[in-house]
Amino acid sequence: MNIALLGYGRMGQTIEEISKNRDHKIVFKLDDDIENHDLNDFEIDVAIDFSVPKAAFKNITTCFKHAIPVVSGTTGWLDDYAKAREICKKEDSAFIYASNFSLGVNVFFELNQKLAGMMQGLEDYSVDIEEIHHLQKLDSPSGTAITLAQQILEQNSKLKGWQLDEADEDEIPIHAKREENVPGTHTVTYESSIDKIEITHTAKSRQGFALGAVVAAEYLKDKTGIFTMKDVLSDLFKN
């Protein structure tokens, strides 16, 4: 499979390493404005986008207009997500966006959703989310933490939203910390006066995120439509 890397920072370099180990070719690396390049010159099967928030929408939609499917893990641009989906459909392309491509995190999402459903009737428990990342992470809270909060909100009609740090009783507080050399740790805590229930996912390196993105690209090749990591996991578990 021929892969384009949209963004060639640490994550892009890790994706390159894993892609080559899985016998794929990196045929294009973007580290400037995508409009400086003619994507038709490169025989791209799938593009993997880990760029920056201000460039993500243009990178993604430019690929759609060249009939190139896109796997995107860039966070912080989701105000334009609905528009990107519409352009994908219009151009008959394919798209997977995920706040986190780690296969382990996506299992964690499934656990979070199930736990939220179990806890929604237990009014003595309050819930909060903590995320810790490296100092270079630009967005706060993380996209993964927001996804966790959204899953809880879907299961609990008494909660109305989330807030960074301080929150009202009907909101989920998300505590975001930035520390040296932390790839990503997320904890969801339910606490009462009697006990505390926690689920935690701790990333040990970028390898898990990068592997998941490559697996998603393998899934997306030759498809059209909008997909999620649930589709990718279902395909993996089926096999």
Swiss-Prot record:
EC number: 1.17.1.8
Listed pathway(s): Amino-acid biosynthesis; L-lysine biosynthesis via DAP pathway; (S)-tetrahydrodipicolinate from L-aspartate: step 4/4
Catalytic reaction(s) noted: (S)-2,3,4,5-tetrahydrodipicolinate + NAD(+) + H2O = (2S,4S)-4-hydroxy-2,3,4,5-tetrahydrodipicolinate + NADH + H(+); (S)-2,3,4,5-tetrahydrodipicolinate + NADP(+) + H2O = (2S,4S)-4-hydroxy-2,3,4,5-tetrahydrodipicolinate + NADPH + H(+)
Broad EC category: oxidoreductase
Annotated active site: 133 (proton donor/acceptor), 137 (proton donor)
Keywords: Amino-acid biosynthesis, Cytoplasm, Diaminopimelate biosynthesis, Lysine biosynthesis, NAD, NADP, Oxidoreductase
Compartment annotation: Cytoplasm
Pfam families in UniProt: DapB_C, DapB_N
Keyword NADP in annotation: yes
Binding site for NAD(+): 32, 73-75, 98-101
GO annotation, cellular component aspect: cytosol
InterPro entries linked: DapB_C, DapB_N, DapB_N_CS, DHDPR_bac, NAD(P)-bd_dom_sf
GO biological process: diaminopimelate biosynthetic process; lysine biosynthetic process via diaminopimelate
Membership in a protein family: Belongs to the DapB family.
Protein name in UniProt: 4-hydroxy-tetrahydrodipicolinate reductase
